[in-house]
Design a protein with these regions (language model features):
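Inter-lobe coupling/hinge segments of SF2-like helicase ATPases
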Residues: 215-221, 225, 237-677, 685, ...
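Accessory, non-ATPase domains that flank or precede helicase/AAA+ motor cores in DNA-metabolism machines
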Residues: 1-379, 391-407, 690, 716, ...
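Short secondary-structure junctions
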Residues: 529-532, 687-696, 741-747
Length: 757
């Protein structure tokens, strides 16, 4: 019998290493199982078997696997194939992919390998609601309903909804209603259960059974029905389809219909969203459709919850539906039939640090083409790369260009901030046109959203006499001023210090806030509209999940009149009461040193505009800018996506940017500016020798060139059409390997980012 060897993925930044399989383990070592192996001087590591073969490794001394620590596979063959592709495409190691894919309690190490060995995980059950035993008479129910008014209107409304859906002729006999069919929130239903007005029971039902009931019973508009049929037709010719639907067009209803069809076939569905903030509203809608069989997977779950989810999914044969953020693409979903990537244009789908620096969207496309699933990419403002792939026939393309129901696209107005300032028609960073719209909306009981893409009170403070401004001692960037707490803070490294009341440089004047952030807008709006209830949603608020949920819930329930926020409020929320949206400074969106700046400006403006005028009101959006003649801002105001794309494709083809070329960046970091400069120049020269001088830039500082006392330089490699990406990547790897062996520069950190944002 030939000797057997196994390639082992270790939780290190290494390629898989080969070990011999001893005779005693030959029948128990399987692909995907966990094993202990010796490495280095007396060290033992736990890894995952990725391949078993008979080819002798090119090592002088071949070590044997010590033991099998987990016979149940931690990774399926499909997962291992995905890990290999991610490692190859994004120029990292399978060990780094494994560390990202496995929950912490399953990551191979001596302490945790038996933790969940005997756990049994049940499939989801359907939660059923019925009238509480104590109120099953007209008199008792009537008294209970009267007691809810006037203070608990949400509970009263939920009870009326329950009685209406069950039917007055059946409600007193204890007839049941699936909880998912209730429009009321889970919190309201829990209160009713606690009060004895409702009671719950569990009924075991598969997600496939629930999905089968949905088919043909989902209410779609004529435009949605046409789009759904077109998507199905496109899937006969393409594995990936781009759904280009305007804001408010009801893309979620299409996703639910597609998911129901897939689940009814016993196949699994993965629904990806870019931000945690999006999941709350979406989960409510999906639970109403698919019941408690829905799985939610985000980075904010506990380690145990993530581990339980991972094992349950790995043991399932299919018929699962999971909604999650970027990391959910690495879950072990067996018999995967459909991947939905909502807001596919969003930069959050790309992981920047640490490795693997992968795109969940592009990984979903690979899964569609290699693992037999279908992928739908949805957006009101598709990325130019995705649109180009649809335009050239690589993806299918479906257009949904009218809003669902009676909702109309909002009217958009561009307001010139310079002209308003000259006329004295500007107060608290709000032009008269926007102030008038806010006042009218509040008078009608409508809500307002105000977008300013800077957090804090002001971007920086400056001395009016000598020009001093506070800068981070570790990063060199200006410190953001926060009025609450009177502090200056670096939004890169977190450094914080008290705001000075006297200039530290000239010792004369008091530094003054310059510019404005969300904190200042919140204060100014509260002063301008003293009777309005104002809240803020930005990165500072989002640091607390509970606080963020409270802000969103308050606005959703009409308890907040004006919501001030950053990019977070552009993320696909569906707030019915919003009739006015204000963009306070569109200029700072354009001021980014990035070839995607205009595309992202357009996307942000269209997305935030789309928050206005849902359901039965048209809505108004005011875009404030000092550049009212800027093409991108005009195109966004008109919602003219195709004009923006035409302009951008023309420019990118001329200058060699995606989708007409691929980009790889190599980032170098060191605590010495001189050392990182020396090393970066040396590496750039070598890359130019290997790849060609036209394809490699000189070393240059990125937009943020120092963080936490570490200096940063970048080299960009451009891969033109017709050039093999794999060959260029091999040459980059060769240069990086040589660089790492050089004793002079080897302490310089290097990272590779394929297809950077």
């Amino acid at each position: 019998m030939a000797n057997l060897y196994a390639d082992i993925i270790l939780p290190l930044a290494l390629r898989p290493l080969s070990f011999a399989i001893g005779d005693s383990l030959a029948e128990v070592v399987e692909v995907g199982c966990g094993v202990e192996v010796p490495l280095g001087s007396g060290k033992v590591y736990t890894g995952i078997v990725s391949r078993i073969h008979t080819t002798r490794p090119p090592y002088k001394n071949i070590k044997e696997i010590l033991s099998v620590v987990r016979t149940e596979p931690l990774a399926s063959p499909e997962q291992l194939a995905l890990w290999r592709w991610i490692a190859d495409y994004y120029m990292c190691t399978e060990g780094e992919v494994m560390r990202a894919a496995l929950p912490s309690l399953l990551k191979p190490n001596a302490e945790s390998h038996e933790l969940f060995e005997e756990e049994v995980f049940s499939l989801g059950s359907e939660q059923m609601l019925s009238l509480g035993e104590g109120v099953r008479s007209e008199e008792a129910l009537g008294e209970a309903l009267e007691a809810l008014l006037p203070r608990r209107k949400a509970q009263y409304k939920a009870m009326m909804e329950f009685c209406d859906k069950v039917g007055t002729d059946r409600v007193f006999s204890g007839a049941e209603l699936p909880r998912r069919q209730m429009e009321a929130s889970l919190a309201v239903i829990h209160k009713l259960v606690e009060g004895g007005l409702l009671q719950t029971t569990s009924r075991e039902r598969s997600t496939a059974e629930i999905a089968a009931e949905l088919i043909g019973h989902t209410t779609l508009s004529e435009a949605q029905t046409v789009a759904l049929d077109s998507t199905a037709q496109n899937f006969t010719r393409h594995q990936t389809v781009l759904l280009h639907g305007v804001t408010g067009s009801g893309k979620t209803e299409l996703y639910i219909s597609l998911a129901a069809n897939t689940l009814a076939e016993g196949r699994s569905v993965l629904y990806l969203v870019p931000e945690l903030a999006l999941t709350e509203q979406l989960v409510e809608r999906l639970r109403r459709a698919f019941g408690d069989g829905l799985t939610v997977y985000t980075s904010r779950l506990t380690a145990r919850a993530r581990t339980e989810t991972y094992i349950r999914l790995s043991r399932s044969r299919g018929g699962q539906i999971v909604v999650g953020t970027r990391s959910a693409i690495l879950l072990p979903l067996n018999n995967l039939g459909l991947v939905i990537v909502d807001e596919e244009h969003d930069a959050s789908f790309k992981q920047e640090d640490p490795a693997p620096r992968f795109s969940a969207r592009d990984t979903a496309v690979w899964i569609a083409h290699n693992l037999g699933a279908k992928t739908i990419l949805g957006s009101a403002t598709p990325s130019i790369e995705s649109f180009y792939n649809a335009y050239t026939g690589k993806y299918g393309y479906v257009r949904l260009d009218e809003r669902y129901g009676s909702g109309e696209m909002p009217q958009v107005m561009i307001s010139d901030t310079l002209r308003s300032a000259k006329r004295g028609e500007r107060k608290g960073h709000i032009n008269k046109e926007l102030a008038d719209e806010i006042r009218a909306a509040l008078a009608e009981g409508r809500q307002v959203m105000l977008f300013q893409n800077r957090r804090g009170f002001a971007p920086y403070i400056e001395c009016p006499d000598c020009g001093w401004s506070g800068r981070c001692p570790s990063c060199g960037v200006t410190l953001t001023y926060y009025k609450k707490g009177e502090k200056l803070r670096c939004n890169l490294c977190g450094h914080s210090e008290p705001a000075p009341h006297k200039c530290p440089s000239c010792k004369v004047a008091e530094p003054q806030p310059q510019g404005f952030g969300t904190e200042k807008v919140e204060e100014a709006v509260a002063e301008m509209f003293p009777t309005a209830r104002v809240a803020r949603l930005d990165g500072d608020v989002a640091q607390s999940a509970a606080r963020m949920r409270a802000v969103i819930s308050s606005f959703e329930n009409g308890q907040t009149d004006i919501l001030v926020g950053t990019q977070l409020i552009t993320k696909g929320f569906d707030f019915e009461g919003v009739s006015v949206v204000g963009v306070l400074n569109a200029d700072n969106l354009l001021c980014r040193p990035d070839f995607r700046a205009e595309e992202r400006t357009f996307q942000t403006l269209v997305q935030i505009t789309g928050r206005a005028g849902r359901k039965d009101n048209c809505g108004r959006t005011i875009i404030q800018t000092s550049q009212p003649d800027n093409n991108t801002i005009i195109q966004a105001a008109r919602g003219d996506y195709y004009a923006m794309v035409r302009n951008q494709l023309r420019d990118r083809e001329a200058f060699g940017y995606p989708p007409f070329a691929r980009i790889i960046t190599i980032t170098l970091r060191h605590t010495s500016a001189e050392m990182v400069t020396f090393g970066a120049r040396k590496l750039a020269r070598r890359l130019k020798e290997l790849i060609g001088p036209e394809a490699v830039t000189d070393a240059h500082p990125p937009a943020v060139s120092k963080v936490g006392d570490v200096f940063i330089l970048e080299i960009m490699v451009r891969i033109e059409r017709g050039v093999s990406p794999s060959e260029v990547k091999a040459l980059i790897a060769e240069a990086i390997t040589e660089f790492g062996r050089d004793k002079v520069v080897r302490r310089i950190s290097t990272t590779i980012n394929v297809d950077p944002n």
